[in-house]
A protein has these predicted regions:
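Short nucleic-acid-contacting surface segments enriched for D/E, G, S/T with interspersed K/R
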Residues: 88, 123-131
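Acidic, glycine-rich low-complexity segments with interspersed aromatic residues
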Residues: 90-91, 104
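Non-catalytic linker/capping segments at the edges of enzyme domains
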Residues: 1-82, 102, 107, 120, ...
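Compact, glycine-rich, soluble single-domain proteins
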Residues: 79-80, 92-95
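N-terminal export/assembly segments and adjacent metallocofactor-ligating motifs
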Residues: 109-113
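Conserved double-stranded beta-helix
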Residues: 115-118
Length: 196
């Protein structure tokens, strides 16, 4: 799709999210558009069913089909399969990062943390649908640093029942931090503290 069409869309299917993860969805990306979603198996979304923005606020809703053979059910826990709660939190960060790109932010995405996380349910192999609803409380582009940030509150539901609550989840886009030379050593081959 063309960049203007990408920015105008209000939903994305599984193929499109996978193409975004591989950096091939947008045919004419602006300079600096380097963010990606993770590829499977860490991609925790099958589709974005709603995305909208009103000024500094917005909303993004993603869904994932639960599969009996999902990789995490094979190891977490043996004899008592349950999706790790942290993967639900990661789905929220993935959606916020995608929102930043869709809203016009440029750079590579990074999760920046969250406030309160509460788990009051679980995802099991015979569940059908995980829905992640994120209300973006603030989206801002920071021209001096060339970065963008989204902060949101999220509810994760399984088969229509709320089971996780995540408050003040934060994801940012940052320019000139991508490490494209993997597995070779290079300028950005090591981690450590990021300057804000």
């Amino acid at each position: 799709v063309k960049y203007a069409e990408f920015r105008a869309r209000d939903r994305f299917d599984s193929r499109e999210l996978l193409a975004f993860a591989h950096g091939t969805l947008v045919e004419d990306p602006p300079e600096g558009m380097s963010a990606r979603l993770p590829t499977p198996p860490l991609l925790m979304l099958d589709r974005v069913v709603e995305i909208s923005r009103r000024g500094p606020r917005g909303r993004i809703v993603g869904e994932r089909d639960v599969r009996l053979d999902d990789w995490f059910f094979q190891c977490h826990f043996l004899g008592d399969p349950v999706q790790p709660g942290c993967l639900g939190v990661d789905a929220v960060w993935q959606l916020l990062g995608f929102f930043c790109n869709w809203a016009g932010g440029l750079g590579s995405g990074r999760a920046l943390g969250c406030g309160e996380v509460e788990f009051f349910g679980q995802i099991r192999p015979h569940d059908r649908l995980v829905r992640v609803e994120v209300d973006v409380r603030r989206y801002a582009e920071l021209p001096e640093s060339g970065s963008a940030i989204a902060i949101g509150d999220a509810t994760l539901l399984v088969d229509g029942e709320p089971i996780y609550s995540i408050r003040r989840a934060k994801t940012g886009l940052f320019r000139d931090i991508a490490y494209r030379g993997y597995p070779n050593p290079g300028e950005r081959a090591r981690g450590g503290r990021m300057e804000r």
